[in-house]
Swiss-Prot record:
The gene is ispE. One of its GO terms (biological process) is terpenoid biosynthetic process. SUPFAM superfamilies: GHMP Kinase, C-terminal domain, Ribosomal protein S5 domain 2-like. One of its GO terms (molecular function) is 4-(cytidine 5'-diphospho)-2-C-methyl-D-erythritol kinase activity. Pathway: Isoprenoid biosynthesis; isopentenyl diphosphate biosynthesis via DXP pathway; isopentenyl diphosphate from 1-deoxy-D-xylulose 5-phosphate: step 3/6. This is 4-diphosphocytidyl-2-C-methyl-D-erythritol kinase. The active site is at K26, D153. It catalyses: 4-CDP-2-C-methyl-D-erythritol + ATP = 4-CDP-2-C-methyl-D-erythritol 2-phosphate + ADP + H(+).
């Protein structure tokens, strides 16, 4: 359902609302894709990393459950029962026995279908916002249990930071890492890329012997996160889905090449793509690389980000 969002709805948060939640985008520093499981998912061994590109969800009291949105992808997303935000709110209501009544408004910056888990981020934001609005008082771990039924990335985006994901990605545990800030350039492509399509393409490439060797263990990546040198982390980045994304969107090869030519320490496709992310030596280098990519015809938008950052948080 949709409902008009009025400027006066943006008053400061009071005792009963509104509740505003910011939620970050996600990249995969390591995405190892195993065989297809009987439940239709692939076994994953991944390291998630939350970065400073945020969506914002505002929840207000209402007589029904409604959703409006603005920003990235406005007009392209259905705002009905199929939307992950609505599904998340209903899942929380169903688990806690409260009426699913809220007016939700999404301000979106994370690109749609870009390999940055934008939909999963918004589901995580809805769980945190509605939990506060409805006073259901769930812990982060309890919210993450509900999140696991909504999507593989959603539990991570409840927590944020940097974490190891196993199973289909929904089993999340924090990693031991130095308190280092890593600087990234995010090159957003025109259009999105379906995650299921990317996985099917990887299966096809592997069956044809046309995919690279699987990444395997996360040990090298996890060890790199315990070092302060971004060059060590750069050498450990990897994504088994990159072959599939490049097969489906060959132009991404030029984006990766341009980023590394501009001075990035390494570049990979983010998740299932088509966004590419580049690790920079520092903040100034990231700004320079983003400016160079923006001047070329290799992406729709290049922006800087840093990580790790917190997951869905009120404020």
């Amino acid at each position: 359902m949709t409902e008009a969002w009025r400027p006066e709805d943006d008053e400061p948060r009071g005792a009963s609302g509104p509740v505003r939640v910011r939620v970050p985008a996600k990249i995969n520093l390591h995405l190892g894709v195993g065989p297809l499981r009987r439940d239709g998912y692939h076994e994953l061994n991944t390291v998630y990393h939350a970065i400073s590109i945020h969506d914002e969800l505002t929840a207000r009291r209402g007589d029904t459950l409604t959703l409006t949105m603005e920003g990235e992808g406005a007009g392209e997303l259905a705002l009905d029962e199929s939307n992950l935000v609505i599904r998340a709110a209903r899942a929380l209501a169903g688990s806690t026995g409260v009426p699913p009544h809220a007016r939700l408004h999404l301000r979106k910056q994370i690109p749609l279908a870009g390999g940055l888990a934008g939909g999963s981020a918004d589901a995580a934001a809805a769980l945190v916002a509605c939990d506060a609005l409805w006073g259901t008082g769930l812990t982060r771990d309890e919210l993450a249990e509900i999140a696991a039924g909504l999507g593989s990335d959603v539990p991570f985006l409840i927590h944020g930071g940097t974490a190891l994901g196993t199973g289909r990605g929904e089993a999340v545990s924090p990693v031991l890492a130095r308190p280092t800030v890593w600087h990234w350039v995010v090159a957003v492509a025109d259009g999105g890329l379906s995650t299921p399509v990317a996985y099917r393409e990887l299966d096809r490439l592997r069956a044809a012997g046309a995919a690279g060797p699987p990444l395997g263990s996360t040990d090298t990546l996890l060890a790199a996160l315990r070092q302060p040198d971004p060059r060590v982390l750069a050498a450990a980045l990897g994504n088994d889905l990159q072959d599939a994304a490049l097969a489906l969107r060959p132009a991404l090869a030029a984006t990766l090449k341009a980023g590394e030519a501009a001075g990035a320490l390494a570049g990979i496709v983010s998740g299932s793509g088509p966004t590419c992310v580049f690790l920079a030596a520092g903040a100034a280098d990231a700004e320079r690389i983003a400016a160079e990519l923006s001047a070329l015809d290799v992406c729709r938008q290049a922006r800087t980000a840093h990580g790790p950052v917190a997951g869905a948080r009120i404020g």
